[in-house]
């Protein structure tokens, strides 16, 4: 299984099942608007960290912060009810 798909599936499962102590549960369990706002703040924060790492030409930090950015973007997508398959289809459309 593709590692990104596996991570996305785990995020979706945690949003649904709400296991105690889960970071995903922590940032997605407020009322929908507040949760989405929190997630959006994290996406913005992580995007800024990727930019700073890139400006410093720090490959290790770019990779680390990009993983955080992709993870939080996946949380936002899953919280918004967007499936991995829908996202994949959008990428396929763009490959033409």
Swiss-Prot record:
Keywords, comma-separated and alphabetical: Amino-acid biosynthesis, ATP-binding, Cytoplasm, Histidine biosynthesis, Hydrolase, Nucleotide-binding
Catalytic activity from the UniProt record: 1-(5-phospho-beta-D-ribosyl)-ATP + H2O = 1-(5-phospho-beta-D-ribosyl)-5'-AMP + diphosphate + H(+)
First-listed, main subcellular location of the protein, grouped into a coarse class: cytoplasm
Tree of life domain: Archaea
Leader sequence segment: none
Keyword flag ATP-binding: yes
InterPro entries, A to Z: HisE, PRib-ATP_PPHydrolase-like
UniProt entry tagged with the keyword Transmembrane: no
Pfam families reported in the protein's UniProt record: PRA-PH
Compartment(s) where it occurs, according to its Swiss-Prot or TrEMBL record: Cytoplasm
Pathway(s) per entry: Amino-acid biosynthesis; L-histidine biosynthesis; L-histidine from 5-phospho-alpha-D-ribose 1-diphosphate: step 2/9
Family indicated by similarity: Belongs to the PRA-PH family.
Name of the protein described by the UniProt record: Phosphoribosyl-ATP pyrophosphatase
Record lineage: Archaea, Methanobacteriati, Methanobacteriota, Methanomada group, Methanococci
Name of the coding gene: hisE
